[in-house]
């Protein structure tokens, strides 16, 4: 059976029932049909004095084109904890339509461990991402309207981009304002994918609607004739934008196929943004459950670094344990084994590729000072000899390995890691950030590059050097740094998988996200608008005359 067929074969509980199981009354949710709901603001006030549960962060080794199943394992762990009678809640990101119709597919898990209704979640869900798109593009239209009606603020350069929640490389560089009308000034522009929009980051970092509005007002939109920054609040745009986001700021409640509550909210990418679900969703889940399972995008060098240095710093949180998801296929891929031979037993390939996993373990355990366990997401092609080799090697390093078979067995396939996590979260940690906010912008970038990526150093292109000095002069030198780079390698070169030679990270430019409260450093050739593959997933997605959807995975 396909994922969507498995999902449709399960009878879901009414969302009112799921809400009641975690102490939320029917009047405190806003239902979107029978199986989806928004959690109202009243709940935040009601649970504010509850004791926090334990926070478990799920990450992965460097991703491969084969997929590692991080969301699948996250769901399996939450279901597994319920199997051993622990009150667990999921706190995940919302899928973007770009990957759903592109190459990666959806983000609702797979097999017997999925969040549901999967086709709704993977498509429009409750409209959060569309609301973000509208707020983003409203700001663009307000900027151009201001320029049209006299340009009182003396815009010389507009840095704010429009967005759309699709992969569309044609929109990377465009020309706007070509109508020839008086006062419409043509200019070169571009689109970002919505999940890379600063408004997505703001939604995920805002504590409440008041904080949201303040952050929206602080968005840098352009520069005047004297190179002074111009902000959204100078255009009086923040109120209208916040109004568009009044429902989007409320976390969404759904369930797994085994009826574990799942709070799904926000969805920035981790390669081009900070890669975590919303602070509001995570904090709410911690008040409602004893164990909260959340994830950070891509590998531990990207999503986890940003989860810890950006999200946890802002929210005053820290994980009680970190799960690194690995697959034997991925380890062999990092060991140089071709995709066509990846399912064949190959101890030598594992021996060559396990270094990638070691580096992520070292970062979590020693660089961040956190408890760590490895979850091996098992496939049918994995052999006992391969599993034993990995287990023995991790034992030598004092790291526990748990075999997770959630895809095939549901929560029953994750009871081992669930029990191990119950023990692990009670161990003491010595959590530390990679850098302090008082350090120079370059120092922050270099600490991430050297300590987390393992680079020899950092090379700054001229535009990047200028931006660093400019942002410091503007008073933004104390912001955290969000490095945008490829997810496939510790380096900024996606083809450099082993990273066993000396390499440097090249920072070509920086972008100030004054509203979200961080600086983006662009490394390598990272794009903020992806393109579709030659044969996108969209080709296999269809709907019949009865409304049944096929092809989403």
Pin down the residues of each PLM region.
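Flexible phosphate-sensing "switch/lid" loops adjacent to ATP/NTP-binding sites
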Residues: 1-553
